[in-house]
Structure formats: structure tokens, C-alpha cells
A protein has these predicted regions:
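C-terminal structural segments of small proteins and small subunits
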Residues: 50-81
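Amphipathic, hydrophobic secondary-structure cores in small proteins
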Residues: 9-61
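Right-handed parallel beta-helix/beta-solenoid
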Residues: 1-8
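Intrinsic-disorder/low-complexity, polar/charged segments enriched in Ser/Thr/Lys/Arg/Asp/Glu/Gln
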Residues: 4, 31-35, 67-69
Length: 81
């Protein structure tokens, strides 16, 4: 696993978590892993859809006590916008 960058989006409702995740991914480097922590249940659909659109790998989704943790890998550095 490459360098991990965490973004805390607890308390924000969609579309903010998706926009912030996209912004961080666009700024990410080849091999970097982005950890997104949020509590909006809509992100369970929206973040995986964003990963599909951008061509990145959603490595893991975890839920604990109403919080969701996504691990997203930019494996190529060549994102689709």
C-alpha cells in the first residue's frame, strides 16, 4: 500500500463528501491511497459510483457505529474525470 491520505467528512451530507473525495483524488499521486471517513449513508452508493467513474479502485468499505470508512487506491495515476 502506498502513502495514505485521510479526509474526515463526518457531519457533511452529499454531495459534499463526493465533491471533496473527487478533489482529493484529482490531487493524488500514483499509488496513493485515500481514506475517506464519513457518516452520510448516501455515500455507500455515491463513493463507489465515483470510484467507477474515475477509474480508481475501492479497496475496502467498513461501517462501525454509523461511520463509514472507504479506502480508495489510485493505482495508475491516470484518473478519468
Amino acid at each position: 500500500m502506498g502513502k495514505v491520505r485521510s479526509i474526515d467528512l463526518l457531519g457533511f451530507l452529499c454531495p459534499i463528501p463526493v465533491h471533496e473525495t473527487r478533489r482529493v483524488l484529482q490531487d493524488s499521486e500514483d499509488g496513493e491511497v485515500i481514506e475517506v471517513v464519513c457518516d452520510d449513508p448516501e455515500t455507500l452508493h455515491d463513493i463507489p459510483a465515483l470510484c467507477d467513474r474515475m477509474g480508481v479502485i475501492l479497496e475496502k468499505v467498513e461501517e462501525k457505529d454509523g461511520e463509514f470508512r472507504f479506502l480508495i487506491a489510485n493505482v495508475t495515476g491516470e484518473l478519468q474525470y
